[in-house]
């Protein structure tokens, strides 16, 4: 009787998980399916299986919009995302090491200030940032999107701090005895040991920057500089008929880099989050 009850509970549990997972995946499945349909079929039926597979959507979408091929938008997104991710991860690790290992005047004060910046919505600092970067002549370039990332990001600094605090201080002392200065201790001892949290931060930042819309919208004016997220918005023109099939086709392609990064580093992502929680 108990075994039958457990089996029944297990059945309903897995049924719920499958149903919930399908609901979560349905928008993505619908987008992929719609990338093979024409406009009439996209909005005329809710079926996930196209009646006639239309591969022209990918061809038309890849031609781009506004005279700019879509490969340019992908190149811009990779350029922005990769540089911003590298700058964020390395600078955040450096700042996290400073907070976790070095004692200096006002450390707690600056740490609290850093945490407070995490609570500010981006809309609060959006206009001041634009004014500053406009006066610097950085608008309509990738500078305001990339250069600030080399100053560290509070979320990743806090995440890495928890990991570094779990490392034995004796490692630093041994390296210091061997003649290493603080920067050498960081690059040769600490940095290699925090690989799990570095990979976790890389995945998160890559995902956030690849999907970033408001930043490029605010600072990029030339279509030749547009990222994928902005380019997808350009496809929708209220003055003319919108090729929704091409939009969904390019939207499907834009998911591939994120999906590949997640699949490749999935093991490290889980490890980085779990070990950071334990060490914190």
Which role does the model predict for each range below?
Residues 2-280:
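A structural signal for multi-pass alpha-helical bundles of membrane permease subunits
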């Amino acid at each position: 009787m108990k075994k039958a009850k457990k089996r029944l509970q297990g059945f309903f549990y897995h049924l719920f998980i499958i149903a919930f997972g399908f609901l979560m995946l349905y928008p993505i499945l619908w987008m992929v399916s719609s990338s093979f349909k024409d406009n009439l079929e996209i909005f005329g039926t809710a079926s996930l299986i196209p009646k006639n597979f239309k591969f022209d959507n990918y061809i038309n979408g890849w031609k781009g919009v506004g005279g700019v091929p879509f490969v340019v938008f992908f190149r811009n997104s990779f350029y922005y995302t990769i540089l911003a991710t590298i700058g964020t991860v390395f600078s955040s690790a450096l700042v996290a090491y400073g907070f976790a290992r070095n004692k200096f005047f006002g450390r707690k004060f600056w740490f609290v200030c850093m945490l407070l910046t995490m609570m500010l919505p981006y809309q609060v600092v959006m206009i001041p940032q634009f004014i500053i970067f406009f006066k610097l002549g950085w608008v309509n370039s990738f500078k305001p999107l990339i250069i600030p990332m080399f100053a560290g990001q509070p979320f990743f600094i806090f995440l890495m701090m928890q990991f570094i605090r779990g490392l034995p201080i004796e490692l630093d002392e041994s390296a210091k005895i061997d003649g290493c200065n603080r920067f050498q201790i960081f690059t040769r001892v600490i940095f290699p040991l925090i690989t799990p949290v570095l990979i976790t931060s890389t995945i998160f930042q890559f995902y956030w920057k690849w999907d970033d819309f408001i930043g490029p919208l605010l600072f990029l004016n030339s279509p030749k500089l547009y990222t994928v997220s902005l380019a997808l918005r350009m496809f929708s023109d209220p003055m003319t008929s919108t090729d929704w099939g091409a939009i969904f086709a390019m939207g499907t392609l834009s998911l591939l880099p994120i999906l590949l990064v997640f699949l490749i580093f999935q093991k490290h992502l889980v490890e980085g989050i779990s070990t950071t929680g334990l060490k914190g």
